[in-house]
Design a protein with these regions (language model features):
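Membrane-lumen/periplasm interface segments of specific transmembrane helices
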Residues: 113-204
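Hydrophobic/aromatic-rich transmembrane helices and adjacent perimembrane loops
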Residues: 45-49, 81, 90, 137, ...
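Short acidic/glycine- and proline-prone juxtamembrane loop motifs at membrane-interface regions
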Residues: 37-47
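Membrane-interface transmembrane helices that cradle and orient dolichyl/undecaprenyl
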Residues: 14-16, 55-70, 103
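Membrane-interface anchor segments at the N-terminal boundary of transmembrane helices
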Residues: 37, 175-244
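Transmembrane-helix motifs of polytopic, lipid-linked glycan transferases
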Residues: 1-15, 54
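Signature aromatic-anchored transmembrane alpha helix within multi-pass, membrane-resident enzymes
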Residues: 20-24, 73-76, 92-99, 114-122, ...
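Membrane-proximal, lumen/periplasm-facing interface regions of secretory-pathway glyco-
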Residues: 300-350, 365-368
């Protein structure tokens, strides 16, 4: 989170912004509700956003120097961004395209640099891509529902509007909701088409300000980003052409190729922080200083609202069990699932006592496996190798010592209790949780 703020401020300086612009850019990120919430959980949105910002900053350095050191660092940042989250393919692509353009325009001087950067990106991701292809038969893994394979002007328009509405729930009240729900049909887009809306449309989105891991709205920042292109069109704001074009292309590619879903807002973090330096320049361009100061106060005040709700609260006056000033991170993992925390802790304690070298992970589409690895890191000297198991063939081929299974729960209890299987005599036998019959059998053997 701190790295994102520093990265945004550095880019603002690279774009010619003074100290005030840099501070405004940092403030834009520091008060971004999505980023604040993601900074205190196990999601990877902030991680990929940091690498994307580092990539953008190094791109500007390389654009000026055209040197090998910066292009190699640039390749590392792109590689780590992609390794952190698949959405980085879209976010980084305009910058990759720009690098390729400049390298091909001066092949004698820059082509080898471009090849070196590409080699670094591939080397960092090759093991993961190979394993993903082995498990799913595709390098995109199980993310097919996130990709819009047949985009049209209609799907683009709907995606732009619906993604903006994710951050402005107040626009989904009363008759406005019916208007937005009717927009896809008016543009020739079938809201029941699962290739376009794999998780249905706006009826699945709760139209209220929320502070949770999957849904947190950037209300103020989204309005500011909408105002920027309007000001550019009206010639009220002159923006750095190269950087703003790349940021705009990132937003455009996202709207064209990624499907909409109610919790897509958390994926927007990378794009919001990329736009932060431009936001700093934009706020600084306002002729009325009182308006700038008022906007800064609004940003700061909105942050307090973020800390007062949701799963993890921050207030010296609030001793609520969700307040992370008074509770450990491990405790806060289970704010929504208090009846499961001990099951996870017991499973980790059991695995740690066995000192495994490898653990197979069998999960369904949306399993809650994050706490397991956080707990495990605190319980063992050396983390075991984690292997994703998707079939019996994987079990036979990879042969992990233990398999940690997180089956799908029920609508009433969405999380199922973890089960652990141990490989014995070539077969996997359930060893946790210990049943009464198994415990009795062990005693008899002893």
């Amino acid at each position: 989170f701190v790295g994102m703020i520093a990265g945004g401020m550095r880019i603002a300086g690279q774009l010619g912004g003074n100290e005030k612009v840099q501070l405004l850019s940092g403030l834009f990120i520091a008060t971004l509700p999505n980023a604040v919430i993601q900074a205190s959980n196990t999601e990877s949105s902030n991680i990929v956003a940091f690498w994307i910002l580092a990539m953008a900053s190094l791109f500007l350095d390389w654009l000026k120097a055209r040197d090998r050191e910066n292009i190699c660092k640039l390749g590392c940042c792109i590689g780590f961004a992609i390794l952190s989250k698949g959405s980085a393919y879209v976010t980084a692509f305009p910058f990759v395209l720009a690098i390729a353009f400049f390298c091909l325009r001066s092949p004698r001087k820059l082509l080898l640099q471009g090849i070196a950067a590409a080699a670094i990106i591939i080397a960092l991701n090759a093991p993961h891509l190979a394993r993903t292809y082995q498990a799913y038969g595709s390098i995109v893994g199980g993310t097919e529902r996130n990709i819009l394979y047949h985009p049209t002007p209609g799907t683009l328009a709907v995606n732009i509007v619906y993604n903006f509405l994710l951050h402005e729930p107040w626009l989904l009240k009363g008759p406005l909701l019916g208007f937005w729900q009717g927009l896809p049909a008016a543009l020739g887009v079938d809201v029941n088409d699962k290739t376009i809306f794999p998780w249905r449309g706006l009826e699945e989105y709760e139209a209220q300000f929320q502070v949770v891991d999957t849904v947190t709205q950037n209300i103020i920042q989204a309005i500011l980003l909408l105002a920027m292109p309007v000001s550019i069109i009206l010639r009220k704001f002159k923006t750095p052409w190269t950087y703003s074009s790349l940021v705009g292309a990132t937003f455009l590619l996202y709207w064209i190729f990624l499907t909409w879903h109610p919790w897509a807002g958390r994926i927007h973090t990378s794009m919001f922080v990329l736009a932060a330096p431009l936001a700093g320049l934009y706020i600084n361009s306002w002729p009325k200083k009182w308006l700038q100061k008022t906007f800064v106060i609004i940003l700061l005040a909105s942050t307090f609202l973020v800390f007062q709700g949701g799963l993890r609260r921050l207030s010296i006056f609030d001793s609520n069990e969700r307040n992370f000033l008074y509770n450990t991170r491990n405790y806060l993992y289970f704010n929504n699932y208090k009846h499961f925390d001990q099951d996870y802790i017991n499973a980790v304690n059991f695995l740690a006592s066995q000192h495994p070298k490898s653990i197979g992970l069998e999960i369904y589409d949306d399993s809650f496996e994050y706490p397991l690895w956080a707990f495990m890191a605190d319980s063992v000297r050396e983390m075991p190798r984690i292997l994703h198991i998707t079939s019996q063939k994987d079990r036979d081929t990879l042969k992990p010592e233990f398999i940690l299974a997180l089956p799908q729960g029920t609508p009433e209890l969405p999380l199922a209790k973890p089960h652990i299987l141990e490989r014995k005599n070539g077969e996997y036998v359930k060893v946790f949780p210990v049943t009464e019959d198994a415990a009795s059998s062990d005693k008899n053997q002893q």
